[in-house]
Amino acid sequence: MEKRIAICPGSFDPITKGHLDIIRRAANLFDEVIVLIMVNYTKTNTAFTAAERVEMARRVTADIPNVRVDYYAGLLADYARQQGAGGNAVCWGKTNLPH
């Protein structure tokens, strides 16, 4: 059977308890969850650098064995294809849904 991969993309500036809840839920449903720290070009004043956000995400997800954290500055679709996750899932939080 093909590995089921979920990507949880976001700027995670900072990562919150809400983000972590979504990540944990995804980890229960998928074989692998990638927390993808991305660049949000509409956010010009970030509180933390990309490296700091990656480190924070790694720390708070360290106890979840099927989660890994990565950084990507390109398009989500390109990253998903590179990871072999093109046909799998993307996790979105409620704030990302249209009102």
Predicted ranges, named:
Residues 1-99:
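Nucleotidyltransferase catalytic core that binds NTPs
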